[in-house]
Amino acid sequence: MNIRMKRGMALVLTASLLLAGSAQALFGLGKSKPETVSPENGPTARDLEIRTYRGIPYLGQLEAADPDGGELTFAIVTQPKKGTVTVEGTNFTYTPKENAAGGDSFTYSAANSAGAVSLPATVTVTIEKTRSGVTYADTGEATATAAQDLAERGVFTGAKIGDKWYFEPDRTVSRGEFLAMVLETAGAEVTDVTMTGFRDDDAIPTWAKSYAAAGVAEGILRGKPTEDGAVFSCEDPISFSEAATVLNRVLDLGDVELEVWFADREAVPSWAAQAVGNMEALNVLSVGSFGSDRLETAVTRADAARMLSAAGTLLRGEKDTGLLGLLKKS
C-alpha cells in the first residue's frame, strides 16, 4: 500500500459537530521483546514495552507461553519506582505517580497449574508528557491512554464543553468517522473533492467526501455492492468485522494461519475471517477485549480508540510484536 505522508493533518470534531451527530489492547500495542529464558518445561514470560501519558493509567495484558498449554497465573515480582501496578487475571494496570515522567519498569512472572514458575520478564514503561491541552473527563482506565494518544497525535479530539473535554467513549462510530480516523492515523494525504463516485454520493456529508475518495484511491475502501453500484453508507455504524477489514488493508503485515490462531473463525463472515484473525494476532483486535461473538455489533469510540492506537504504533514502525515472525504464513 502506498501511503503518502502529510504533516499537520487532524480530524478535530467540535462540540457543535458532535452534538449534531457528525463527525480504542491497548494504547500503542505493547511491544514484545524476545522471550526470556525459563526453566525447562515451565512457562515463558515475555518482556514488554509500553507507553502512557503523565497522570493516565495504562491497562494492558501480560504475555506468557506454556508448553503444556494450560492456564497461567501472573504475579508482580518487582514493583515500578514511578508508579504502581496491579494484576487481575492476565490484565495489568500501571498507574503513574503524580507528575511522573520518563522511564520506569517492573517485572512479572507466570506460573502454570503444576507450580512451575517462569523467570521474571521486564515491562519497560515510558511516561510521556501531554502537549495537546486535552484532558478528558469521561474516559475510564480501559480507554484513557488510547483516547489521549489519538488527541496527542492529532487523529481525533472530542468535544470541549465549558472548560471540560469529553470523549464520549460509549458513542457509536459511523463508517465515515472510522475511515477518517484510520486515514489520519496512517498519515494519508487527503484532498478536497466534490464527488466520490459512490452511488450514494449525495448522502455523504461534505467533510467525509475527501476521506471516502482517499480511501478508494488507497485501496482500503470498496463500499457495499448494490444493483446500482457501490454505496459508502457513510452514516451507518461500523461493525468490528468491517473495522478489522479496513485496518488489515492499511497495516498489510501478512496473514496468519487461521487454523492455528483463530479458533472462532467460523463465527465470523467469510469475507472478514482473515482480517479478524490477523488483527487478533497483532492485538489490534484482541480476544477478551473484542470477543468474536461481538464482531457484528457496532464499534464505539472506546473500541475505535484502542484499535487505532495499537494500529498507529505499528504504522510508526514498531512492528516487532514477537508474533509476526511466528504467525505469518510461509
Give, region by region, the residue ranges found by the protein language model.
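Feature responds to low-complexity, polar/acidic, surface-exposed segments characteristic
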Residues: 16-42, 46-54, 124-145, 157-179, ...
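Extracellular ectodomain surface segments
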Residues: 37-77
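Phosphate/pyrophosphate-binding loop motifs in nucleotide- or prenyl diphosphate-using proteins
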Residues: 154, 219, 283
